[in-house]
């Protein structure tokens, strides 16, 4: 979402029209401060380059950020903090919280046009089907 498509690949800078970000790590500093730093050998440069939250000036498409309420507190915090930072940068962002979903169940909702993320993806593309009648 923060790639310079024109410079790096010769593609239109607005080639991506939107994105759905799920259960992500948007600032990698906490990883380096955790026990994981023993096996995840990030350098300062890698941390900077891979921390999306530090490149919001390059974000040029609306995004949807999501997480499930049964995910780890760190995934939830990262999503909330990232959404707040995107809003503060004046960029379009929406937060979707999957009540009762864990890290592995959230992606499963993409496969159904009425599922939490499937519907969000279709709505973002302006292709959402009508809600089923009860």
Which stretches of residues belong to each language-model region?
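Short, conserved loop/helix-junction motifs that constitute active-site signature segments
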Residues: 12-14, 56-59
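Alpha-helical scaffolding within the catalytic cores
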Residues: 41-54
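Loop/turn elements at helix/coil->beta-strand transitions in domains of secreted/extracellular proteins
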Residues: 15-18, 61-62, 91
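Lipolytic serine-hydrolase domain surface
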Residues: 53, 68-71
């Amino acid at each position: 979402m923060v790639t310079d498509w024109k410079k790096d690949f010769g593609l239109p800078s607005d080639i991506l029209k939107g994105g759905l970000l799920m259960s992500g790590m948007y600032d990698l500093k906490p990883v380096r401060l955790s026990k994981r730093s023993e096996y995840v050998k990030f350098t300062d440069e890698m941390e900077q380059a891979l921390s999306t939250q530090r490149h919001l000036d390059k974000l040029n498409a609306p995004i949807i950020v999501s997480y499930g309420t049964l995910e780890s507190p760190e995934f939830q915090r990262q999503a909330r903090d990232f959404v707040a930072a995107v809003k503060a940068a004046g960029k379009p962002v929406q937060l979707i919280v999957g009540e009762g979903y864990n890290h592995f169940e959230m992606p499963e909702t993409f496969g159904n046009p009425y599922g939490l993320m499937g519907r969000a993806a279709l709505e973002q593309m302006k292709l959402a089907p009508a809600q089923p009648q009860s």
